[in-house]
Amino acid sequence: ERDSCVEKSKCGKYGYYGQCDECCKKAGDRAGTCVYYKCKCNP
């Protein structure tokens, strides 16, 4: 589930992006951030 967030979530140019954050939360993580245009989940 978490891996699909990285693939599916579009990341903007800077910082947080809602889609990534939401996806990570659904995957059971605390939050999601964008790092180098990729979604990363924070446990």
Curated annotation (Swiss-Prot):
Keywords per UniProt: Disulfide bond, Ion channel impairing toxin, Knottin, Neurotoxin, Potassium channel impairing toxin, Secreted, Toxin, Voltage-gated potassium channel impairing toxin
Tissue and organ expression note: Expressed by the venom gland.
Domain of life, per lineage: Eukaryota
Intracellular or extracellular location(s): Secreted
MF annotations from Gene Ontology: potassium channel inhibitor activity; toxin activity
Cellular component GO terms held in the UniProt record: extracellular region
Cystine residue pairs: C5-C23, C11-C34, C20-C39, C24-C41
Pfam families the UniProt entry points to: Toxin_17 (PF08086)
UniProt keyword Secreted present: yes
Role played: Reversibly blocks Kv11/ERG potassium channels. Is less toxic than ergtoxin (AC Q86QT3).
Protein family: Belongs to the ergtoxin family. Gamma-KTx 4 subfamily.
Swiss-Prot/TrEMBL domain comment: The presence of a 'disulfide through disulfide knot' structurally defines this protein as a knottin.
Name listed for the protein in its UniProt record: Potassium channel toxin gamma-KTx 4.12
